[in-house]
C-alpha cells in the first residue's frame, strides 16, 4: 500500500548572535566565509563568484563585494558580533574587513592567521616580466 505523501517540513532558521568571519586572501582570489562559534558555515562568497573573472578577481574592490555578499546573507541569522580571521597575503585583506564593518557588524577582534612556514616548501620562483 502506498504511503501518504509526507508534508515538507519548514526549515527552522537558527539564530546566531556571535560569529567568525574567515577571510582567505590569496594573490588570485578572495574567499569570505562566515561561521558560528563552532565553525558551521552560515554564508560564504568569493570574488570569482561575485562576477569578477581573470585578473579582476584579485582586486580589493572584488574582495569588498564578496565580503558584502557574505555579510548580507549572514544577517538573516541574526548575527551581530564578528571576530575576523584574515589569512593570506592577497590585496583584498583590508577592504574585506572594511566591507564587513560597513554591513553593520560589531567587529570584536581582527586576527592574522596566515600560516608561516618554518622553512617548509620551496617558494615559487620570482617573476621575470
Curated annotation (Swiss-Prot):
Keywords: Ribonucleoprotein, Ribosomal protein, RNA-binding, rRNA-binding
GO molecular function: rRNA binding; structural constituent of ribosome
InterPro entries in UniProt: Ribosomal_uS11 (IPR001971), Ribosomal_uS11_bac-type (IPR019981), Ribosomal_uS11_CS (IPR018102), Ribosomal_uS11_sf (IPR036967)
GO cellular component, one term: ribosome
One GO term (biological process): translation
Oligomer status and interactors: Part of the 30S ribosomal subunit. Interacts with proteins S7 and S18. Binds to IF-3.
Reported function: Located on the platform of the 30S subunit, it bridges several disparate RNA helices of the 16S rRNA. Forms part of the Shine-Dalgarno cleft in the 70S ribosome.
The family this protein is said to belong to: Belongs to the universal ribosomal protein uS11 family.
Name the UniProt record assigns to this protein: Small ribosomal subunit protein uS11
Organism field: Pseudomonas putida (strain GB-1)
Lineage: Bacteria, Pseudomonadati, Pseudomonadota, Gammaproteobacteria, Pseudomonadales
Gene: rpsK
Amino acid at each position: 500500500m502506498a504511503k501518504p505523501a509526507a508534508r515538507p517540513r519548514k526549515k527552522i532558521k537558527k539564530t546566531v548572535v556571535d560569529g567568525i568571519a574567515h577571510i582567505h586572501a590569496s594573490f588570485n582570489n578572495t574567499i569570505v566565509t562566515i561561521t558560528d562559534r563552532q565553525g558551521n558555515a552560515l554564508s560564504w562568497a568569493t570574488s570569482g563568484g561575485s562576477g569578477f573573472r581573470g585578473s579582476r578577481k584579485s582586486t580589493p574592490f572584488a574582495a569588498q563585494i564578496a565580503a558584502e555578499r557574505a555579510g548580507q546573507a549572514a544577517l538573516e541569522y541574526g548575527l551581530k558580533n564578528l571576530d575576523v580571521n584574515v589569512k593570506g597575503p592577497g590585496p583584498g585583506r583590508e577592504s574585506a574587513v572594511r566591507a564587513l564593518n560597513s554591513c553593520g557588524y560589531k567587529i570584536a577582534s581582527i586576527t592574522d592567521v596566515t600560516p608561516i612556514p618554518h622553512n617548509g616548501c620551496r617558494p615559487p620562483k620570482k617573476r621575470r616580466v
